[in-house]
Amino acid sequence: MKLTLKRDLPLMLAVLLAIWCMWYARPVGVDTLFPGLEPDSIYVTLIDFTGSSHEDRNLVLTAGTPEFDALWADIQELQFRRSPLNVVVQAFPFLENLSSSSKTMEDGDITHMFLDLYQVNGLPSSRTEQLRFWVDAWEYRDFDHGVNLPLVMKNAKDIGQSMAHDLWDQAEN
């Protein structure tokens, strides 16, 4: 069987692209999203919208405390899938806001949770990474490209709301 460049190259490229998409969309954790991150502190911001008002709560956890260790362990256990289209959004950041979505809130849902992960020790300058949860969906901030990229996981709402409610009880107004 003789390979012809005109006929077989597009097929080989399509197969390689399909393999790459499957690899990129595999389950990953924060160790893949934020390689080498060893945070010194985690800043938690929770926002709960009820009607036309909202309540904000904040929590700062520092490394070496039991609360920090528990939250960092929970964050490290999270497994997400990334959309291969994230790479397109990284290359063309203006595409980030082209789609809009609305969220259906249920009674007791916490609207937003921001997990800011800060690392200062051992680095020439500080490093910040961010995971976000909005009602039922996760995303992470790609500071290098200035975009928020979606993450998918099984039971995303249940896991996010449970984590948000646990942190809500620890946080201050």
Where do the model's predicted regions map?
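Function-determining sites in protein domains
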Residues: 4-173
